[in-house]
């Protein structure tokens, strides 16, 4: 009884590795045509510039960058996009890695594919089928355009996609705190992700009811209200 779960877990790791290798192979082909290699710096790097400005003690960028979409207030120039990706890049910029956006975009893309696979496995989809549909959702869709490119518009969309999948997965697993925290991070990348909240709450409600079928909504709130703390901190 103890051997089978271990074997299943190890098999899942192998399947996830296969999935990541497939995604990487498709990316490699795309990069040969686009030149968007993950070790290259990006011209449209608003989040890197924002992280650098924060480390220098400024909220504004210090000067104009005519090729970027910036907000102007009191003759100061600000990044006009939600800031969550800048928080992700901050520790890397701190150590001097000012081209980290490309590698972060690649890692986030792989993570999105992995969580697509994990969601499918939650519903007891056979592993090969789960890999196929995870690939179909990612490299088999227009997601590929945004995922293999780390420009400011695309990396935010890429992060929002992955974080939303993570929020869905943890909602299905009845881990409310993680689910809502990742959802809040997704909103910090793309504000329209807020529209997913009703669907997420429905998944959370169903997952809780599976474990506690007698609980009403007010009971769930009383038992799980502390799960709102991470989301509130992020917001």
Predicted regions and their residues:
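Multi-pass, polyprenyl lipid-linked donor-dependent membrane glycosyltransferases
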Residues: 104-107, 139, 143-171, 185-196
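Membrane-interface transmembrane helices that cradle and orient dolichyl/undecaprenyl
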Residues: 164-178, 210-211
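Start-transfer (signal-anchor) and selected internal transmembrane alpha helices
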Residues: 1-42, 130, 224-231
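Juxtamembrane segments of multi-pass membrane glycosylation machinery
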Residues: 74-105
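Transmembrane-helix motifs of polytopic, lipid-linked glycan transferases
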Residues: 99-125, 166
